[in-house]
Amino acid sequence: VRKRVQPLSFFILSLAISVVSIGVGGCQPPAEEASSAGKGAPAGAGDGAKRLQIAMIPKGTTHIFWRSVHFGALKAAEELGVDVQWRGPQKESDRDEQISLVQGFVNKQVDGICLAPLDADALVGPVKEAGRGGVPVVIFDSGLKAESDAFASYVATDNFRGGELAAKALADKLGGKGNVVMLRYNQGSESTHQREEGFLKGIAAYPEIKVLSGDQYAGTTTESSMDKAQQMLNRYGDEIDGIFAVCEPNAEGVLRALEDRQLAGKVAFVGFDSSEAMADALRAGKLSAIVLQDPVQMGYLAIKSIVQAIRGEQVEGFVDTGVYVATPENIDSDQIKKLLFPDKA
């Protein structure tokens, strides 16, 4: 059952990550399945009731963003008394593997699926198949180009707004004038596409800022992003006054390229999503700003929404998990610290 979207009150979870072993660190094969169980009985269930089995399929598992999503999912699973099976593709560009994972969980007849689609078009069919098979789906992080009744809810950041905030942060750093480059992520990724479009709309409000390049895809890894950033620096050289990178691996790649050329801190630079290296760079003045999501909240609310859908409760059509901007000036505020360092909150 769905109801008209209402404004969502945001809150930041207080974490104690030492109590949970997330099990998706860089040394573990990303596609290896990880199961997590809540400790309590299912809410509203009688004695001996079957625990709900929820599959959660991210775009990948190695980046800190996904580990934070996983932690939030575990928090919700513990509170609701459900089991979460966490499994993602080895590469964030492997659509076929993600499709196979969805189909596999449908065949296993899990009670529900939370999915972050790698491709807004390619995952439509598998999601509809899940619905026909009686397995409800909640989409999280990145959108799906399907009718709204194809899935129970969409839990995500307002990525277009995030792109606009990135444009404002970069323009403020440049004093409203200069030449900028935007590096795109990967074709088919709806979340980053929205950030890119939001940025281009936002930066267009500054007539003295010129976009030198906004159509180049940096790819899904830090290495490919570093290579693309080097290409942009080779092509435009001293003309570049500012850069926007739309996700964690892209931003880390740009940071490495700037550091390699001793330009970090000299070229205005705004990233999206964080890591320890990015947070350190922000504090050191190598980054002008980082647009932040709340991945812990995203994981938490995705699990909460799918459980509501399974139990026939009202579910919001879109759940906005919030978007924030970290700067060197506010990096030590409680809210920003919890988003930058969820493992230390």
Model segments located where?
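Bacterial N-terminal signal peptides
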Residues: F10-G23
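N-terminal cationic leader/targeting segments used for protein routing and processing
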Residues: K3-R4, I22, G40
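N-terminal leader/targeting signatures
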Residues: R4-P7, S18, K337
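Bacterial N-terminal signal peptides that target proteins for export
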Residues: V1-L13
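A residue-level marker of the well-folded mature domains of exported/periplasmic proteins
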Residues: G26-A345
